Amino acid sequence: MSIPEYRETFAIKHDSVSGATAPKYEQILKWWLRNEHGISLPMSAKPWAGICVQHGVDLTFGLADYDKDAGQQQPLDIAQATKLMLDKYDSYEPRTWDEGRDAEEFEAFREHLPEMMANGIAAVKEALQSANMIEGEYQIWHTEEKIDVPIMMFQDYSGGNKQADLKCSLPVRNPIKKDGTRTWRVPKPKTEPTKQQVMQQSVYWKCTGQLPCLLFVTAAGYHVADQQNTPALQEDNLELAYQEVVMSRQ
């Protein structure tokens, strides 16, 4: 597949599933900032917490730093995985230019990560209970003739003709009280995917043929959304969502 000139201008030779639902103007702005000024959007405590929760889950299934040829490796017990997960989390340095907001979130999230990791483990086990073997995250390429570059994707977990995508929701800050302190609300797991999440899952499905399920995880519990309990994840609706993704990238 030849790369069109406007893509070459921004040194962008592929799309990714994670960005497939972003408005085109936003995507072009990101390309321009990265190519012309070397600027990428910075990490923050919230996505970093989700990355670390998945890392902990991966460790307990022997899927950390997954290699498709090697397959699952020796899993760690929950205590070992939790320690390594928190060590990874603690390596992050909060932003210093947002009046302490990121640092406050970083501190508040930490105590809830072990519970989120445990719920993530339970969600993966439930979602892929019929799988003889679980695959972890590795790079997959998909070509769509109506899109002018290849599409890159990374599935969180797959097996038994299903793929599972971990979606973490972190605690939410409450208003500051009169005494100057603040509490945090732990949300219940979501039960319905957003339109953008369905669009993302439609690309995974079209590429692999594996039916998607979304693992909504919080410190309060988890919910597995799949084609059995979520009409939006049934094949007819996935096809409609996929066509919408294709149209949005043209």
Residue ranges of predicted features:
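Short acidic (Asp/Glu) and glycine-rich catalytic loops that position anionic groups and cofactors
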Residues: 29-37, 168-170, 220-224
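Short hydrophobic alpha-helical segments that form membrane-spanning helices or hydrophobic packing faces
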Residues: 29-32, 198, 242-245
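Short amphipathic alpha-helical face segments that pack within enzyme cores
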Residues: 52-55, 199-206
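Non-catalytic protein-protein interaction segments used by genome-maintenance enzymes to assemble
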Residues: 141-200
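Metal-dependent nuclease catalytic regions and adjoining charged, substrate-binding loops involved
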Residues: 136, 193, 203-250
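Secondary-structure boundary elements
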Residues: 126-130, 160-163, 207-213
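Hydrophobic/aromatic-lined pockets within catalytic cores
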Residues: 57-65, 168-171, 206-209
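Metal-dependent nuclease catalytic cores that hydrolyze phosphodiester bonds in DNA/RNA
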Residues: 1-154
